[in-house]
Amino acid sequence: MSEILKNDVDPIETQDWLQSLDSLIREEGVERAQYIVEQVIGQARTSGVSLPTGVTTDYVNTIPVAEQPAYPGDHAIERRIRSAVRWNAIAMVLRSQKKDLDLGGHISTFQSAATMYEVCYNHFFKAATEKNGGDLIFFQGHAAPGMYARAFLEGRLTEEQMDNFRQEAFTDGLSSYPHPKLMPEFWQFSTVSMGLGPVNAIYQARFLKYLDNRGLKDTKDQKVYAFLGDGEMDEIESKGALTFAAREHLDNLIFTISCNLQRLDGPVNGNGKIVQELEGLFTGAGWEVIKVLWGSDWDKLFAKDTSGKLTQLMMEVVDGDYLTFKSKDGAYIREHFFGRYPETAALVADMTDDEIWALRRGAHDSEKLYAAYAKAQNATKPVVILAHQVKGYKIPEAESKNTAHQSKKMSYESLKGFRDFFELPLTDEQVEKLEYIKFAEGTPEYEYLHGHRKALNGYVPARRTKFDVEYKVPALEEFKALLEEQPRGISTTMAFTRALNILLKDKNIGKTIVPMIADEARTFGMEGLFRQVGIYNPHGQNYIPSDRDLVAYYREAKDGQVLQEGINELGATASWLAAANSYSVNNQPMIPFFIYYSMFGFQRVGDMMWAAGDQLARGFMVGGTSGRTTLNGEGLQHEDGHSHIQAGIIPNCITYDPSFAFEVAVIMQDGINRMYGEKQEDVFYYMTTLNEVMDQPAMPAGAEEGIRKGLYKFETVEGKKGKGHVQLLGSGAIMRHVREAAQILANDYGVTSDVFSAPSFNELAREGHDAARWNLLHPTETQRVPYVAQVLADLPTVASTDYVKGYADQIRAFVPSKHYHVLGTDGFGRSDSRANLREHFEVDARYVVVAALSQLAKEGTVSNQVVADAIAKFGLNVDRINPLYA
């Protein structure tokens, strides 16, 4: 750009244009001015004028003073309530610290956000009613002490509970952060670790729209609020779904980002401006951005700033300096902020240093915040409020310091100073004892506190533990077609699809089934659902799909049932979690079935799945194309041999690796019954399915209980008497090789084999350890026998799966025989035929036979030479590298 264009060559003409715009705004309003400016910009582009993108605005409040609505609250009473909440939050954390239990705790985050939350508690947060689920609030995890402090003032928590903050093992304590598992009637959503709150809030807002558009629940009056930290926005999960929210027109979604400019160790962007960065990000993603940066004290300064230097200065100052200013004093701010320009220095010439120090950031001003939230209520797109605040507000040891996040203590003098600033009704002795503040019934504060919550339907947060609407669980007989022998081979994935179709057609619960796919429907043979129930899209289908002439064409509809999530496992899991919590959040039980490549589930979104356990989710995760050797051509990053290990660490995740179609049916019916039947258990299911076609026999009589528990005898293959007897366990893809091995053992070696299907080694291990624990603690009582020991005999045993050896090895302690050998697929996957891969990982029928003979040799039934001869006969390379290291 030339030097001429960098400077204003005709200031008078420029001033004329600006005055014309001011006149237009004054006479015809902001909307008309916006329209005219857009037309001018359009004409400029048409005429070849190069324009900046313009995704950020000046570092000032978005809402002009003239457009601020009147504040509906009583400032004096609200300040007294807010101050009491502030104190109780600090007192709770400090009282727990006195016990010397190394409990930790955070006092700075809530102090910076207290005004923000209190404005919402008094004027916006709606609780649930019988007809309406209320607003859904994702509270910032580190601000949890403030929510406890308010609930204590409301009489919903006791002093004993407050004193047991972060002490939950043996007392009625309060969890460190929002954890529904630990406080099931209080917290609705898990928001830690950081980043989970934003993405889950987006998909929760989307699921409300889904319910409404499908006519299942009227959610139009509900909002989803998410309170986040500016440091938290560095998490990929925080940013990854922003464009999705705009695409879905989630006008029911409100983010509030606490822009205290600090993360855990220091500034978020000390050399820049995180507010501007976030504004550009959200504006570009299609959100409405409302900046609340400066309190009402600044309004008179802006009004006096005819030169525009104050706004210029605010744009020039970087975040590192803003943090330093609030860690110093008024004199420092006068010199190092206002003193940068004569014009800005003149603005505060008649102000004392104390008055300068008292100038507030926007997030500490109720009127500015109320204006922002009021504007957000009527938005036509998702909204983000960027609220400028001071971390550790009014805590001398923490205020705006890099150590603020780690501040867990306050001196007696600091506590007295805090009391004095907030005018708390506490004596010096009460301050020293950290006594809690409560309002007596009948006081103005008590009546105001409860009156405003009653006007908003009740108290938040609060969580429903069970749904109370009628829900009829289908009987196993409804899956009869899958319990019988199949006329031709099918994969267990196809069996799942058929079972899903049975559920979709169920007249009682069909509408509550939520099929979810991460852009792989055709891989799983599920494209028929596109036409059958449609793909959900809030905008319908405004184009003619290229495959419209096909039976299974890509049909999108506003009331579509399938949630097609695209290539987006994290978002799809967040979507699943929203549906899996609908029973609690909406009193509307929904059964989500999310099917995906099993390698891209728990491994990719493990933190989200742990949160699903915490949130007491109910639903099905289906790991398709599972097993290390089954998705044979895709190679190392696609072949799953360990998802059951990862799923098994989540206590309320029930996992299965079925071998047969009838097992799939039993597992699905059992899961629905446990989660949505009379008991309403807080569990969710993980089931792996195969893309390998196999023969599908009929279910053996009486096998249901064994399938559910994880082990049952499938068949016995008779050999010759006296030649040996083994037990062969298998699951999933390797079950066919186990059955083949049983035939070889009988035909070639005369060995009898009891073949067991083991749909869940995880469930077997849990039950076994539970029995072992009981036995340990009850030495004088009749000892319990683990289920594995009840089912298996004291015979040489071999377990074979398409997963790492650790999966089947979990039950070793409960197997009656000391001769127990496990085959598995430890090591990196690779591409080849299934036969070659199973040879590579040493899990095919030949290795099962050799392992069985080896165990027989150990008990003396056959000689070691028999084993050696079998190895030679099968051509096994005994000198090749262990596949674990290959």
UniProtKB/Swiss-Prot annotation:
State which Enzyme Commission number(s) the record gives: 1.2.4.1
Give a single Pfam family match.
PDH_E1_M
Reported cofactor(s):
thiamine diphosphate
Q: What does this protein do?
A: Component of the pyruvate dehydrogenase (PDH) complex, that catalyzes the overall conversion of pyruvate to acetyl-CoA and CO(2).
Q: Which reaction does it catalyse?
A: N(6)-[(R)-lipoyl]-L-lysyl-[protein] + pyruvate + H(+) = N(6)-[(R)-S(8)-acetyldihydrolipoyl]-L-lysyl-[protein] + CO2
Q: Which InterPro entries match?
A: PDC_E1_N (IPR035807), PDH/Transketolase (IPR051157), PDH_E1 (IPR004660), PDH_E1_M (IPR041621), THDP-binding (IPR029061), Transketo_C/PFOR_II (IPR009014), Transketolase-like_C_2 (IPR055152), Transketolase_N (IPR005474)
SUPFAM superfamilies under this entry?
Thiamin diphosphate-binding fold (THDP-binding), TK C-terminal domain-like
Q: Which keywords does the record carry?
A: Oxidoreductase, Pyruvate, Thiamine pyrophosphate
User: Subunit structure, per the record?
Assistant: Homodimer. Part of the PDH complex, consisting of multiple copies of pyruvate dehydrogenase (E1), dihydrolipoamide acetyltransferase (E2) and lipoamide dehydrogenase (E3).
This protein's name: Pyruvate dehydrogenase E1 component
Q: What is a GO molecular function of this protein?
A: pyruvate dehydrogenase (acetyl-transferring) activity
Please state what class of enzyme this protein is: oxidoreductase
Lineage: superkingdom:
Bacteria
